[in-house]
Amino acid sequence: MWLVAHPASQGSYWTVVTAEGSATRWQVYDGTVSDKTILQQQAPGRPPVVTSGESEPRLLDHPSIMSRNAGQMMASGEGTSRRMFVATNGDLVIAGDDRFRLPIDAPTDARPAAIGNGTYVVYGDVTGRYQHGALGDTLEPSSLVVVNPTNAEVIARTVLDPPLVFEGLQPLVADLDGDGEPEIVTTIADSENGARIAVYSPAGERIATGPVYGPGWRHQLAAAPFGPDDTTELAVVLKPHVTHTLEYYRLADGDLSVRAPVDGISSHTYGSRNLDGAVAADLDADGTVELLVPTTDRRRLVAVSRTSSDARIQWEWELGGQLTSNLTGVGLDDGGVAVGAATANDVFVWST
């Protein structure tokens, strides 16, 4: 199941897409659910994308040439919006007034991410040389591709040497070191050493690499001012299917180090393409950013926050069943936050 949250004039809108593709939209305000709207049937497996502006939110359709498991996003530049997605043959499609295709040989489940200044990053050059299969299949990307959709051009392409691959569907973009410039956060892996976090510049240059603990995945979740001094840190789950350890990384002077761990966290289900397993926000209006993540049994959500010396679970929400959706949220007009999650039988929305 997928949830998409978006702002409303009062409260928030929630688009709910079931595993079978049935889609509905609801408005949640002041503890009341209203305005149910039935939306067009969606292709199962694809993450839904909702556009909003002055009009009501609109659920984007899926072009016929779009890969079955791909995500899509709207890219803007020079006053024009363009849709970006991966086609069935691995091309990156840029569709606006005109349609362009960039032959980057992307995995068919790859999803672009915005860097800023009109540039975007996506994984490319699919390979079968790493047979882990944690993210839905045994095909992984081996390159990081930076594009400018306005000019429909590739402006940087970083290719990993064998046996390395990128193990992920979408890079994470954030200013990790506080210099005002974005970094591109990825997970790289090989069959001998396992996975580790690798950070790149928008030009595709490797800036830093995190520690390696042996075979197993690293699930990059969010970057936010988690640090006790409000320093930006990166939240990552070490081996979410085995070790279940949340780690906070900090990038400083080219060094990427782990500052605090918390056990008992499972942000991903093995084989799933749903990687949206956390929300970072001030969830209880205490002035501190918490990370909301599932526990190992995926029947509870816990809020983790950093202290001066470690990280701790501050409070939890019981779900009454196993989590079956992504976690997502939206800022409210009153300064609060609405967060949503779903089990097989219920959709929950909490507002602060």
Say what each PLM segment does:
Residues 1-352:
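Beta-propeller-forming repeat regions
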